[in-house]
Amino acid sequence: MSEDVKVQVHTLGEIIVKLEMPKTFIDEINNVFDEKEITTVDWSTQLAGKIKKEKLVNHLLDDNIKGTFQMCFKEYLKRSGLSLIQTHQPVLDNAWINDMFAGEYNPAHFHSSKNSFVGLSSVLFLKTPDTYGEEIINPRTPSNGHLEFIGGQQHSLAISQLRLSPKVGDFFIFPYTLVHTVYPFSGTDQVRRTLSYNCDIVPKVMVKPKENK
């Protein structure tokens, strides 16, 4: 391409923001969950996953942890360039931890909230197994244990799917309505642990002072 030609690329559709969270933050969440899991509520009936251990953890997260998540959701709004950042604010909803083992999986689904039609969901990787097992076929394009986002555009000039094998500390934020799935894995008894946090995006005039922290 000639240096005289200026190129810009514009994309439409959903925005996914990835952050890399520090090990101290990951360790803090893992430690409090391991110590106090007995106090958590089974959340599996509220979720799409075919996963035995899915626990609501709102009460395990202290104000510092919640504040960090709040800042991450604000960063999403800032990075996305959406005009909503001027008129709306993120308000934390429910958080839960999935301990996923071999043979379990999460069917394609999206998130919602009883409080808002507009919102962000997320997934933070807390633990990953050393292996996801042998691929049945085509090992050069692995799927075992992978997280996949599925966009709304399916034509040949669009990127319609994004399949990822994240590492511990990776934190993905995306709209409630973005369809996503997690493939099963095998060959290990180690856990694949993630935390998901829903966050409503509501008009600033509706946010009470205590929710504005």
Predicted regions: what is each one?
Residues M1-Q89, N98, G103-P107:
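Non-heme Fe(II)/2-oxoglutarate
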Residues S196-K213:
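Double-stranded beta-helix
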